[in-house]
Amino acid sequence: MKRIGLKVAYDGTDFAGYQIQPNERTVQGELESVLKNIHKGMSIRVTASGRTDTGVHARGQIVHFDTSLSFPVDRWPIALNSQLPADICVLEAADVPADFHARYSAKTKEYRYRVLTSAQADVFRRNYTYHVRYPLDVEAMQRAAVQLLGTHDFSSFCAAKAEVEDKVRTIEDVALWREGDELIFSIRGNGFLYNMVRIIVGTLLEIGAGKRSAEEVAKILAARSREAAGKTAPGHGLISGRSNMTNGKLENNKTTNPCVTKY
């Protein structure tokens, strides 16, 4: 057996999240279905660096699986993409060490969130941006965002139903900037709690709207209560980005991006 690592992109619009769920279309379900076909009916388990929610997209989700097949690693994207639906694409594949783990080998993870700030809605971006019609004080949001840097207990920024006990995480970088009529949020850290990024964005948007002050962030963190933070921003504006792996790096396979014609 050998372990294969993949970098996967997907449009989360028509998925009930990444993780397999009964009677639901999921990214993991599609990947495992195709791998089962390739392995002549043998079930293959796929493990991901993160489990995205309904409607959330990914540009570089890292996954791994074990296989007894011996064909060249650069054939995996071709084999998988030939059977995957158009809203999933394997960008890269690599042979990785046996101790490589898509989740636990991730040193840092990065997410981006897109907010459309124009007065007019855009039907072509409705699945990829959260439309906010009211004015936003970006400087106030930036002052608030820097208070999230460092290691904190992020209980206030975690969904109440989350079962994880240790809610201490480290945020290495948080930034927001304008690109045309969009406001882009970028957050990088060593790991994220359930709905953490979306709650952070929702809270910053309330600060930008003047419903909260930038100085409230410290109090929200100290409260360690979900009720202290703002609303959870919708999933469709969120994109799971790159993961920095500690052992086993996915490199380009010197092949043409197999997904260029699919989007």
Swiss-Prot record:
PANTHER family linked to this entry: PSEUDOURIDYLATE SYNTHASE, TRNA PSEUDOURIDINE SYNTHASE-LIKE 1
Keyword terms: Isomerase, tRNA processing
Compositional bias ranges of the Polar residues kind: 241-263
EC number: 5.4.99.12
Originating gene: truA
GO biological process, one term: tRNA pseudouridine synthesis
The keyword tRNA processing appears for this protein: yes
Pfam families registered for this protein in UniProt: PseudoU_synth_1 (PF01416)
Function: Formation of pseudouridine at positions 38, 39 and 40 in the anticodon stem and loop of transfer RNAs.
Descriptive protein name: tRNA pseudouridine synthase A
